[in-house]
Design a protein with these regions (language model features):
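Eukaryotic acidic, Ser/Thr-rich intrinsically disordered low-complexity regions
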Residues: 71-75, 204, 209-213, 217-253
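Short sequence/structural elements of tandem HEAT/ARM alpha-solenoid repeats
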Residues: 73-74, 107-115, 145-152, 182-191, ...
C-alpha cells in the first residue's frame, strides 16, 4: 500500500501510480471523472474505485455521473483560438496555459479534439507542434479511445518538414500511453515503427535517442516490463556502437 498523496486515501501501488500518471493528487479532481473513465487508467481496479467512492462520499462529493454539461469554459475556448493567432506572444501564452491545464485529466477533450487534429496539418508549423503536443497530453482524457483512430495522424507529425516541430511532437507522444494498456501498446508500436524507418532520415540518431527517452518515460509511468524489453530490443538495432551506447544510457539512470 502506498502513502496518502494529497488528500487521497491509501490505495494499492498500481492504482496509486495510475492516479499519479493522470496528474490526480486531490480528491476534488475526481469529481470531474466518471467511474468508467477512472477505470480506463492502467492499474486502476474496481476495489480502488470503491475506496475512492467512499472517500468522496465522506466529504459530500461524488464522481461525475456523465450527465452534466461538459462544455469548456470561456478561458479554455479563448486559449484554443489563440494557438492559431499570428501574434507569437499570444500564441505562446495560450500554448503554455493549455499544456499546463492538460497535465491532468480534463472533461473538454472531445470538444477540442477535431480542431486539434485539423491543426496537425496547419500551414503554421507552430500550430502543428502545439496541436501535436496537446493531443499527446489529452491521451489521459480519452475514455472513448478516439486516439486509436487518429494516432497515425499524430505520428505523421513526427516526420514534419520542420524538424523542431517533428521533435517537439515526438518528445511528448509517449503521454498518449497514459490512457491505458491498449494505448501503451499503440504508442510502443508507433515508436517501434519510427525507430526502424528513420534510418533513412537526416536526423536519425536524434530521433532514435528521443524514442529511447519516450519509452523510458512511459516505462517509468507504468512500470510495464514489455516497454523496457521493447526499448532494449530496438537499441540493439543500432549499428553504430557510439550511438547504441548513448541510447543505452537512458536506461542506466
Amino acid at each position: 500500500m502506498s502513502k496518502e498523496q494529497g488528500n487521497l486515501p491509501k490505495l494499492a501501488a498500481p492504482a496509486q501510480r495510475a492516479l499519479t500518471s493522470a496528474g490526480i493528487m486531490q480528491l476534488e479532481q475526481l469529481t470531474k471523472l466518471t467511474e468508467a473513465e477512472l477505470l480506463q487508467l492502467h492499474g486502476m481496479g474496481r476495489n480502488a474505485v470503491g475506496t475512492l467512492r467512499e472517500a468522496l462520499k465522506s466529504r459530500g462529493l461524488s464522481f461525475r455521473t456523465g450527465m452534466e454539461n461538459r462544455k469548456m469554459d470561456k478561458t479554455i475556448r479563448t486559449q484554443l483560438d489563440n494557438i492559431r493567432s499570428e501574434d507569437a506572444q499570444l500564441q505562446n501564452k495560450a500554448y503554455m496555459s493549455l499544456m499546463k491545464e492538460t497535465e491532468k485529466s480534463v472533461d473538454w477533450a472531445y470538444e477540442a479534439w477535431d480542431e486539434l487534429i485539423e491543426g496537425l496539418t496547419h500551414k503554421d508549423n507552430h500550430v502543428r507542434a502545439i496541436c501535436g503536443q496537446l493531443l499527446g497530453n489529452l491521451g489521459k482524457s480519452d475514455p472513448k479511445g478516439r486516439m486509436f483512430k487518429d494516432f497515425d495522424k499524430l505520428l505523421a507529425v513526427t516526420k514534419d518538414e520542420k524538424f523542431v516541430t517533428a521533435r517537439h511532437t515526438l518528445q511528448n507522444i509517449w503521454k498518449v500511453g497514459l490512457g491505458g494498456k491498449k494505448s501503451q501498446e499503440l504508442v510502443v508500436k508507433g515508436l517501434e515503427k519510427r525507430f526502424k524507418e528513420c534510418i533513412k532520415e537526416k536526423n536519425c540518431t536524434l530521433i532514435r535517442y528521443d524514442i529511447s527517452v519516450c519509452l523510458r518515460n512511459l516505462y517509468d509511468a507504468t512500470t510495464s516490463s514489455e516497454i523496457k524489453e521493447k526499448a532494449l530490443e530496438l537499441i540493439e538495432l543500432e549499428k553504430d556502437v557510439k550511438y547504441k551506447n548513448k541510447y543505452a544510457t537512458v536506461w542506466k539512470k
